[in-house]
A protein has these predicted regions:
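N-terminal active-site segment of His-dependent metallophosphoesterases
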Residues: 3, 26, 31-109
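Active-site-proximal segments of metal-dependent phosphoesterases and phosphodiesterases across multiple
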Residues: 185-187, 191-193, 209-252
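Short, flexible loop/turn segments at beta-strand junctions in immunoglobulin-like
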Residues: 9-16
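Active-site environment of divalent metal-dependent phosphoester hydrolases
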Residues: 76-81, 104-107, 134-143, 177-181, ...
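Extended active-site neighborhood of metal-dependent phosphoesterases/phosphodiesterases
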Residues: 10, 24-55, 110-207, 239-245, ...
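Short beta-strand segments enriched for Tyr within beta-sheet-rich domains
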Residues: 16-26
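Active-site neighborhood of phospho(di)ester-bond hydrolases with catalytic His/Asp-centered motifs
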Residues: 69-72, 95-101, 128-136, 218-222, ...
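Aromatic sugar-binding surface patches on proteins
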Residues: 2-8
């Protein structure tokens, strides 16, 4: 697409669980007056002379083992994120989940890269996949509607169902945390209707054969379902919780509160919820019979651990 400077390339017919190599080249279009009258400029590329090609591995089609890292509530603190993740060997993990509020608002492309994309590329994103789950702050700003261009999904929505081996992941979009009529949104929000539409999609997703036959079922939702009395939390709880309680969920990961929290399964929420703070990351290792979780803070200090059996 010669009229754009942002390119999303979809690779088809890749084999599951297979390592691929790639390099990037892009040639400038200086002028395009009409038809085939194109004047080209310089070509920029990844470093093809001094380093090996980038490598990535596609998700496996089968298997119960899975490992991933979760980051959330960075709010543009790219330097803090870099320091926090300095000792992580990202090559050991299947993906990195960005679970919302990586920016405080999204005003332009330059800010998006400055807030976390450039740091993510330097740390891992050239070779380890990102799964992006929008938080309430990423709905804000004049450039917010463009976020999906940088993190496209197969279904064209901010919520989706993903599968790694036989493990299913539900990425649920929380929308905003305050009523749509709040002065902060300037009359531009309609998240009650948006969440109702998402709820109907969720009902179909958990009824799908892919989800029902999964070896484990993991949910990512930026705002915790039991995260307080704000309007967004209440609306999410009223809509999503009755469906999730009947769906055999093994674990939910949330953020939003900027502090660690753990909510064991109970009669109201029938699955455990782990809430990550804004000064830590989560490492999750899944096997056929357990989920092992470590919450790691600055300096690589393990602050909390959890382990859950898979029934």
């Amino acid at each position: 697409q010669a009229h754009k400077t942002l390119h999303a390339v979809r690779l088809n017919n890749l084999r599951p669980g297979t390592k691929y190599c790639y390099r990037i080249f892009s040639q400038e279009v200086l002028e395009w007056k009409h038809g085939d009258n194109v004047l080209y400029g310089r070509t920029v590329a990844s470093n093809v002379y001094k380093r090996a090609p980038f490598r990535f591995r596609t998700f496996p089609a089968t298997g119960t083992d899975c490992s991933f890292v979760i980051l959330n509530d960075i709010h543009g603190r790219a330097d803090d994120m870099t320091e926090l993740c300095r000792e992580i060997n990202f090559g050991k993990h299947d993906f990195v989940m960005l679970n919302g509020d990586m920016s405080s608002s999204i005003e332009n492309e330059e800010q998006l890269f400055r807030d976390f994309i450039d740091a993510s590329v330097n740390l891992y994103a050239s070779e380890t996949p990102i799964l992006y789950n929008r938080g309430n702050h990423e709905t804000r700003g004049v450039f917010a509607d463009r976020l999906h261009d940088y993190f496209p999904t197969r279904n064209g929505r901010h919520y989706q169902l993903c599968k790694v081996g036989s493990v299913c992941f539900l990425l649920l979009d929380c929308g905003e945390d305050k009523p749509d009529t709040d002065i902060e949104y300037g009359g531009l929000a309609d998240y009650d209707a948006y969440r109702r539409e998402e709820c109907e999609w969720l009902r179909r997703a958990v009824a799908s054969e892919t989800f029902r036959n999964a070896s484990a079922r993991v949910v990512f939702l930026h705002i915790p379902l039991d995260g307080g009395t704000w309007h967004g939390s209440n609306h999410l709880r009223n809509l999503f919780l009755p469906i999730l309680n009947e769906a055999g969920i093994n674990i939910m990961f949330s953020g939003h509160t900027h502090r660690y929290g753990f909510h064991p399964a109970n009669d109201e929420v029938r699955f455990p919820v782990v809430v990550n703070g804004n000064q830590s990351y989560i490492r999750c290792d899944m096997t056929g019979d357990r989920i092992a979780i470590r919450i790691v803070g600055p300096g690589g200090r393990v602050a909390h651990t959890h382990e859950f059996p898979l029934r």
